[in-house]
């Protein structure tokens, strides 16, 4: 098949993308087409003033071949449009930055170690300029064009149409639209089939934006480029919606929204337009908020709802500024120009006065917690973070309870009360714990600041000689709930032991003999119904629970994680944690401090409304489903995402449908607000359009949530089987409906879904789901929590980690880009050991853990520059860090590691600071094996390799 005219991942011609003049989102620069601009020859040179690389003559080698060939393609020829996976001409090639190689800058390695061409590695293309020492592959690799030697033919869907006579696909024979559907004025994304076996997935494709949302001209009432929702807030699995349930069912694709209402931990890092005049116009029938896709009627006095078509009156104050006492231009209002907007809510949106921010800390003071340093580290971190806890309205309250086999309440007086001292009250009755002096147990941070500081300083000393091994955490939770339920707030549990007395008592049920067997599934279930029923009661009283778990032994994460799951909280797990290791102490202190500083929404509810004919059918994430379509969050976190499945109940007669997410919440500063996020999508009657506009990362996120649900209800084997069955079903459907049923020796799938098999394999091999007799159930349960809460960019990385080659990274990697000042990352590599050179230095990063892999033949100069040692045997392996040394290469390696942890630039909030493990290829076997489990495309631990996986899929598809 010859090159198609229009490549996937490229925006359509001017006037066709999103709405009228919409520009690509700021975080997607480098992927938009630039019509009319002739391609530049080659790539831009390195900026002047770049730090010069040191010369390692003995270790220099040529990296333009073998496994080190870059995963991108060169710029298109003049007159061509960039194809899927290829940046436009003159645009940066990798991570936003292309560069000419420096022939005078050698790299670490051994010139004799040239590798043959490997499976999945792009082939070098003669005559193309190299990028940072890497050569570009042939254009067919990334464009959906046939492999060399394939017969030429028309491209895109036109090629399918001409080759597969009789099929009503593509422009040759358009499918008949139903009578009520208006003729589509704008073509949608074209479908580019690709052969998964001959044109394999490349990890760099995961950084591409989703297929563009192409709306008809004049879909929105203003020409604002922000009229449709950016993907960092809401991504749909389908960016072209089938008009009927039968077409959706025929496609076998899921229709769901991946929703992340907040893109940062703090408001100032993610500015969303704020409507402060309290003029909120909503539809009288469906209660949707006015948005850029309504229609104004009757000289602008009325507006027609784009969800249910009801005509509503425009509020009189809509065109009037009450503060300035003057008329305003309606077309400048935020809610008509921005798909994401926040309203300050008037009195009628409040059931009671806005609640203050309340944190109740439950400290485990058992022997395990004290001896590991947990009590001292957590108390010190809270003390150091008091200034970071949101308290702008000076209403924030704190409370403290210590827990062993008894409950220890602490009554903290106000700073002005000179005669009172902080007192500890011990309660041993665990069945009905009473509250000794409730008014002194939750104290205002502002009024009691000095006393709180004194208490936190002395707390570790109070229990430093304890020998108590008991933990009545269940009873402590009940007492804490009783204490803060009149106000609502957060209970923060810091525990290093299994609750073994009182309410919610748990038994040691870990049994290594059942790991990897069907009986393992019971270990992932809740052992005590208390944890689910208590969580539901807490949610009703606006109490959210976060768990920080640190046990070096079995702690039953499966049971304890129910508390955050139903209350909008999160479970953080630190296996084998000990403050005696600086890396452990620093990681927890950093994460816990960021957690305390994060702004959260209180008393929140989330609801998704949609165009008539669409219905929200299922909800996934950490919250309590209060009714069929209302999700309740006692506290709304900034670092989680949610998945909502959409059903098509009626035939959709419109060319555009809308889905609107609304989050009603109280800010940390006591202000009631509504965040409204509106997504508009085109509809289609054509199956090819549906597949061409499917978003592989959103689809993976949906199935990650489904797999966790399946694992908890039916077991791990059922979850893995369902993932394989679903992928097989999609491949079979595409083959039957869109590839004419004949694939020869290949495996056809759309270019925009080429990463799906690798992502599903990564999900099946993830520590939460993979078949293994070596994974403790606590580790599994913690991984399942991540698989069902991580924001989409972090989830995709957790499923398919990042691999960077550091010893031969391009000259511009590890230093700031001259234009953006952002550190440039090296191009990512596919997760296969075939990509490794024995003299190399590699970073493997799944977002939770990082491995710095040192090859067995690493040259001495590399070791000296990065680690300050001359011999590999002197290298300290395990948890560690890269020392700060006075040389350019060390600085660049540290910059890459630091940049890989920069979540803000990726449009997500996260407190996670990954551990860094130094791994020697010829070092500790267990550490090496652990790092290798992240190489998804290798065979490991009862899991098949990528080649075997593709072979298995092909066999099942052609059966």
Curated annotation (Swiss-Prot):
Region entry Disordered, spans: 1-135, 163-184
What are the record's GO terms for cellular component? Answer: cis-Golgi network; COPII vesicle coat; endoplasmic reticulum exit site; endoplasmic reticulum membrane; equatorial cell cortex; Golgi membrane
- Report the SS bond pairs: none
| Bilayer topology annotation | Peripheral membrane protein
Q: Does the keyword Cytoplasm apply?
A: yes
The free-text function statement in the UniProt record for this protein reads: Component of the coat protein complex II (COPII) which promotes the formation of transport vesicles from the endoplasmic reticulum (ER). The coat has two main functions, the physical deformation of the endoplasmic reticulum membrane into vesicles and the selection of cargo molecules.
Would you identify the family this protein belongs to, as annotated?
Belongs to the SEC23/SEC24 family. SEC24 subfamily.
Q: What protein name does the entry list?
A: Protein transport protein SEC24
Q: What are the top taxonomic ranks of the organism?
A: Eukaryota, Fungi, Dikarya, Ascomycota, Pezizomycotina
